Structure formats: C-alpha cells, structure tokens
C-alpha cells in the first residue's frame, strides 16, 4: 500500500473544511437518538453516503476525515469507535467492529511532527475486530480473520487467521 504524506504547516482549505465538517457531524450524531431516521441520515452524510445497506454504526463515535471512509453492507461498528481516516479506511461487507476499536490510517512522521504519514486501512469481508483493538496505518485485516480484544495490529492479518496480543501475533488458523 502506497504511503503518502500531508504537510500540516500548509493545510489545504478542503482538508480544514472536512475536519470541521466531521467534528460537527460527530457531535450531532453523538447527541441524536440512535437508530432513528435522523440518526441514520447523519451517519450516512458523515461518510458521504459511502455506507452500505444494513450497516449500523453505534454512538459515540469519533471520525476524522469521514470522506475517506467506505463501509460495505451489513457492517456493525459498536460504541466508542475512533476512525482516523486521512489515509483512507475501507470496511468490506459483513465486518464486525467491537466497542472501543481504533482504526488509524495516519501517523505523525517521527522526525517531523508537522507531517502526517498516511497508509490505508482495509478490513476484508467477514473480518471481526475485538473490543479495544488498535489497527495501525497500512494494515489489511484478512477475509474471515479475527483480531482478539485489546490487540495492537502492526502487520497485515492473513485470511482465516486469529491474531492477538500487542503486537498482535498469529494464535491459530481457522
């Protein structure tokens, strides 16, 4: 996956507008009765209508750059999720994301903190991310993969694999 960099010293107007838009939408979503027509409309708008049929996102949630998130069909995202999406986040069909999960597609350069390094995060079909797991930039969660609760995922997770720990390691193949 190709890394790209964002220079924070010269913020793009579009990125600044998107940042404000996401903060405001998350505030509205987190203060709206869940699973109502209004709530579902706000979630759809946060993700620029890139959310598939039958998908549910539970509050509270924090999303940075919602225009860089794509959510497939029948996805469940539980409470208190954090999506740092400058590098892009793709969640394919039938994925489950438990509570307190962090999907992070960007980080600060270790030598120059005013530069964001960005790599996309992808969760393939039927992947399951356990509570409190952190998925770092550039990671792909494999098809039918399981990430154990509390895992820190620093490397791609192969299809049909269970990983756990910090850093996450293969526990078994399924």
How does the language model describe each region?
Residues 40, 59-60, 109:
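Short linear capping/connector segments at secondary-structure termini
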Residues 1-54, 167-172:
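Terminal amphipathic alpha-helical/low-complexity segments used for targeting or macromolecular assembly
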Residues 53, 58-59, 64-65, 72-73, ...:
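Left-handed beta-helix
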Residues 107-109, 113-115, 139, 173-174:
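Conserved catalytic-core motifs of eukaryotic protein kinase domains, centered on the activation segment
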Residues 45, 69-71:
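Short, T/G/N/S-enriched strand-turn elements that build extracellular solenoid repeat scaffolds
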Residues 10, 27, 31, 59, ...:
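Conserved short-loop catalytic and cofactor-binding motifs
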């Amino acid at each position: 996956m190709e890394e790209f960099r964002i220079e924070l010293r010269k913020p793009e107007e579009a990125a600044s507008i998107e940042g404000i838009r996401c903060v405001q939408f998350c505030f509205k979503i987190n203060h709206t009765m869940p699973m109502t027509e209004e709530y579902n409309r706000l979630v759809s708008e946060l993700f620029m209508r890139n959310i598939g049929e039958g998908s549910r996102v539970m509050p509270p949630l924090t999303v940075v750059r919602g225009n860089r998130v794509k959510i497939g069909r029948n996805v469940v995202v539980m409470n208190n999720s954090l999506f740092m999406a400058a590098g892009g986040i793709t969640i394919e069909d039938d994925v489950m994301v438990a509570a307190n999960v962090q999907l992070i597609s960007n980080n600060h350069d270790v030598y120059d903190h005013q530069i964001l390094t960005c790599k996309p995060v992808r969760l393939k079909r039927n992947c399951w991310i356990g509570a409190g797991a952190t998925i770092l930039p550039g990671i792909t969660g494999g098809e039918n993969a399981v990430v154990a609760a509390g895992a820190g995922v620093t490397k791609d997770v192969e299809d049909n694999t269970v990983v756990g720990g910090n850093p996450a390691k293969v526990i078994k193949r399924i």
